[in-house]
């Protein structure tokens, strides 16, 4: 188990390092494809989530979904009937499709989406909902015929998905001067706490290490998240790597 954890940790840091040098969406596509295959996935997609009156076309960022499936999904406007997308709007934790939908009663249209996805070997998957503090919603999904992920694998995929999404949003913005001006002011103590979070420590553990109260550490973490416009710790770590706050 320790060797597995070490291997996954090395994979994550290699991915973060190589992604930092990515010059285009194609570079990210290649790297993300390798990560997907490592964890047993055949397909992946990164997309924003449109409002109820919008279509997905302009929100889709990157992916290798089967052309046949994506065309059908887009033409039938399945995004608003997709139970995975619906679930991602209401939670901020990653989930395996089969586990999350196990006790769900799907309506006819939602069941149709999942049944038709199976025709393209999208039988199960793993999705990472991503929300910004400003309310923008996105989702990163991995698809396969079968999903087998350890807790360590899930955490790693969450972090890499959040990082890739953040990186792609920055590339789409493509305004270096604005990004430099918008770089948040992070204190030495905040940077230290981000490092501990990236090392897998909980707020309680960090409080013990630094000799501070649990509430104090929680408040610092929440303040960092506000500065980075993210809503949870994995996104905070990913954005900190992208902005070179930590390396």
UniProtKB/Swiss-Prot annotation:
Q: Where is the HTH luxR-type domain?
A: 179-244
InterPro entries membership = Sig_transdc_resp-reg_C-effctor (IPR016032), TF_LuxR_autoind-bd_dom (IPR005143), TF_LuxR_autoind-bd_dom_sf (IPR036693), Tscrpt_reg_LuxR_C (IPR000792), WH-like_DNA-bd_sf (IPR036388)
Keyword Transcription on this protein?
yes
Q: Which UniProt keywords apply?
A: Activator, DNA-binding, Plasmid, Transcription, Transcription regulation
In its UniProt record, which GO terms are filed under biological process?
Answer: regulation of DNA-templated transcription
Q: Spell out the molecular function terms from Gene Ontology.
A: DNA binding
Task: Report the DNA-binding ranges.
Answer: 203-222
Q: Which Pfam families match?
A: Autoind_bind, GerE
What function does the entry list? Answer: Positive regulator of the rhiABC operon.
User: Can you name this protein?
Assistant: Regulatory protein RhiR
Q: Which organism is it from?
A: Rhizobium leguminosarum bv. viciae
Origin organism lineage:
Bacteria, Pseudomonadati, Pseudomonadota, Alphaproteobacteria, Hyphomicrobiales
């Amino acid at each position: 188990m320790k060797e597995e954890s070490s291997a996954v940790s090395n994979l994550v840091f290699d991915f973060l390092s190589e992604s930092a040098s990515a010059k285009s969406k194609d570079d990210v596509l290649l790297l993300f494809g390798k990560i997907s295959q490592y964890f047993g996935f055949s397909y992946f997609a990164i997309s924003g989530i449109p409002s109820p009156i919008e279509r997905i076309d302009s929100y889709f960022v990157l992916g290798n979904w089967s052309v046949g499936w994506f065309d059908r999904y887009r033409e039938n406007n399945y995004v608003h009937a997709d139970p995975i997308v619906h679930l991602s709007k209401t939670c901020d934790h990653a989930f395996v499709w089969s586990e999350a939908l196990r006790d769900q009663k799907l309506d006819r249209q939602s069941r149709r989406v999942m049944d038709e996805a199976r025709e393209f070997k999208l039988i199960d998957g793993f999705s990472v909902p991503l929300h910004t503090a400003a309310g923008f919603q996105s989702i990163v999904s991995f698809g396969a015929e079968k999903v087998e992920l350890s807790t360590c694998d899930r955490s790693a995929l969450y972090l890499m998905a959040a990082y890739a999404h953040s990186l792609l949003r920055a590339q789409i913005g493509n305004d270096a001067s604005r990004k430099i001006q918008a770089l948040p002011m992070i204190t030495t103590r905040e940077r230290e706490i981000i490092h501990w979070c990236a090392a897998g420590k909980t707020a309680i553990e960090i409080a013990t290490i630094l000799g501070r109260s649990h509430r104090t550490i929680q408040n610092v973490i929440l303040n960092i998240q506000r500065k980075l416009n993210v809503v949870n710790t994995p996104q905070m770590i990913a954005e900190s790597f992208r902005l070179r706050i930590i390396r």
